[in-house]
Amino acid sequence: NALLTKDTFSLFNAQRHLIEPLEPEVGMSAIGRSLYGKALKDAFKPLLSPENDNEMAAINSLQVLSLVGNEQSCGILINHADTSTEQRASLRLWASAGLGKTFKTGVLQTQRIIPKAELLADFASREPKWYVVARMFDSLTSLQHVPGLNDIQQSELEELSLQLQTRAL
């Protein structure tokens, strides 16, 4: 509920409080990340609903979810990056940007990243707002900077990044 405020200072503090457990130095386990992600998903559902007219709260929810970096948070971001499921361009923008952050957390395995990146490229080819497309391309570029991969995986994602950007054009 703290994200529903329109007071910038309170909103910043609320977001900071939600992000702190996800900081790399905390070292949250995969199970902890999954449980925290589920709790956030449930708490953010009304904020991300089309009925919520507080887009600032919805955007902050997407920003927090992007740092969870797991499959379920990535699925929420994918849903809000698609014009067929999200009418608000501001949410598509931040969901698209959030996917790049999610990819770069290094939590998702390569085989989980690839189908999400392919969907994002498809969304980019249909997106009517140039500024959303720009964030989608940024997120596709982030595939070239996923941490914790071996040389072969890194090379595959670098190649995929370029292929998907070309395909989206």
Put a short name on every predicted segment.
Residues 1-2, 27-49, 70-82, 105-124, ...:
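Amphipathic alpha-helical scaffolding segments comprising HEAT/armadillo-like alpha-solenoid repeats
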Residues 5-9, 49-56, 82-90, 123-131, ...:
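Short coil turns that connect the paired helices of HEAT/ARM alpha-solenoid repeats
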Residues 8-35, 56-70, 89-108, 130-148:
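Structural detector for internal amphipathic alpha-helices that build alpha-solenoid repeat scaffolds
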